[in-house]
Amino acid sequence: MTARTPLPSTLAAGAFTTAELHAAGLPWRRTLAADLARICRGVHTAGIPDPCAPDGAAALVRLTGGVVSHVSAALWHGLPLPPRLARPAGLHLTFDRSARTHRTDLDGVVSHRVRLPSDHVLELPDGQRVTTAARTWFDLAGMLRPHEVDWLIADGDHLVRPPWTPTGRADPVATVSELSEVLARCRGRPGVRLARAALAEVRVGADSPPETFLRLALIRAGLPEPELQVAVDPADPASPVVDLGYRGRAWPSSTTAPATARLSSRRGTPVGTRTASNGNGRPCAAPGRTSALGSGGS
């Protein structure tokens, strides 16, 4: 049985490379002890051997010089993904094709070798290197199928929205112009057509994928594009805000069923706003008010 020389705290806290083990004054055979697990060749851990875990990913980045990218970077940035991509089989690492690298065929690593400008990479304090949010959005376009374009639009919406914080809205993670710039610099890459189509439909103001999907469904059903984050009563500073709405529109009522007007206090339709059902479940809003879709404050 291999003796268990205690690990220094810098190594015991997470994953480490064999070179880091040697630098700490421990021999290679220490990796054979039962308290350590092998993530892949050259990387071990005292915890669960998961290359996608933060410490495992950081160690693999240090070992290979790669950059966390694609689906792995999307998860790091908190981007919504279709179910088939939400649990990647391995850690996606990108290596700049102009740089000399080694050990890119490791177990648990999905390697990509492409041009990767330095301004498309985030350098984190723990040694982690991750593609920027805008570059990650573009890289996802090469992994999504044409019928999944709505997910790419939702990812774009997610990045350009001003997110809620305890003190109000914050600056967005990326801007539409930043997405456009990355797209222009990645011409000829897989996914460029899908990214271009998605970018044309990215909007500021959608706070969740369901809001994006609803907007797209309305447009594709032949309805006008709704506004996002609309005050129900623009004249009232304290007015609630709805996710989607048609400001000042009056829906024509059905000619085959009488419209029944009612007063409603439900969210999105303030008391005193006259609404009607046209027999098909479609709301009829009085001009000067907002016909609300979705719920506000998300």
Give residue spans per PLM region.
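Short gly/ser-rich loop at a beta-strand->alpha-helix junction or flexible surface loop bordering the NTP-binding
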Residues: 1-191
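Surface segments flanking catalytic/ligand-binding clefts of nucleic-acid enzymes
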Residues: 20, 25, 163-298
